[in-house]
């Protein structure tokens, strides 16, 4: 019996990371010596591990985490978590002397504009990303503000910081993105940087690094970076910034 | 009324980050527009923000987070969170070809040896750190293993990785640390690096970077770093490692 448990555990442990689809299809349940974990507990650990960048490059969330993710997003914890992160960014900003070329960089999707209306129709990340469907949704220009980020955005503006939006959205979405930002309450910005489809970069991390390098060359001081993806926050050319990771338990962009 | 609320909020927002003691003395309650957050919700956000490195350099946890932290540590979530992080480290390790000079670096306190027995007598981080009392406790040599890390340690050893313990404990604790590690089930290691009190470094981050530089010079390949503090995981000379952040909602070491 002990050997069998060991064998099962070994197969589980070896098989898990080999799945291209990451967590989705593989049962997370493992004999642990302290009993089975409930989905709620396991998925809270999944979520924490995503936020602390311990779980990376997952293509879908585990199937058993659909309901816990839904509960998290729609309950008060997600908003509280967003609030705490935005507060920290504001506290940090409010302690600084503001120079005229100081910028805060914000991502767009799931940082200032919520894409939860899209994801709630697509299993909160359990389905693999479908660019066509997602683009259709983006092109509606109907994404609401993430309210805690909107508050922080307004506070940073009133402190005198300039705002740069830096997104992986392609340039053909410029008009709809501008309109959506304004509709959601983000009325002003120093720059809105979308991705030139001719620009070849290996991933979002290097694209965002390259765009930040441009900003530094233009004479801006990057004071803070706020995003829902680690690829917004890691990489080069971060200037003297502190970075702030907003919660996103639904997907990962490399 | 609206103005009054705004004024209170402004005072709260400005006053909060000015406290030397960080979160402790200041009421976290704020009018948010979506109702008051309970301590449970706020402290879960505090914890998440600490793990994702959004909250830094706190000297004590907020007073209202003592009970939620106690519940978290003593409930199954803390252990589940530790398990998930250790699993990720193992999955990552198991996909690599092992070279004879490949090492995993582990911290000691709250990474392999639990200091929860100490912290549960000191408010789970609500009291400012008392080096004398903590040293007395360390010198007992009675710290238990963190069970999920112990499992992972044994698995990494059986994959063929070498283990280096790198700790901010001072060199005078070498004997008690060796004995405590063995007593807790950590029977072997490639190196156990404690801090030379004559070595002056500005903080733990630079101390750990310097020690890693030594390891790289000695020809080791740093494959993974596992610690409960961001100062274990950030900084220079990380080789080709992936890093793994174990949960610690109780204190922060710069």
From Swiss-Prot, chains A, B:
Residues 1-20 form the signal peptide. Glycans are attached at residue 130. SUPFAM superfamilies: HAD-like. It comes from Glycine max (Soybean). May function as somatic storage protein during early seedling development. The lineage of its organism: Eukaryota, Viridiplantae, Streptophyta, Embryophyta, Tracheophyta. This is Stem 31 kDa glycoprotein. InterPro entries: Acid_phosphat_B-like, APS1/VSP, HAD-like_sf, HAD_sf, Veg_Stor_Prot. One of its GO terms (molecular function) is nutrient reservoir activity. Accumulates in the stems of developing soybean seedlings. Gene3D superfamilies: HAD superfamily/HAD-like.
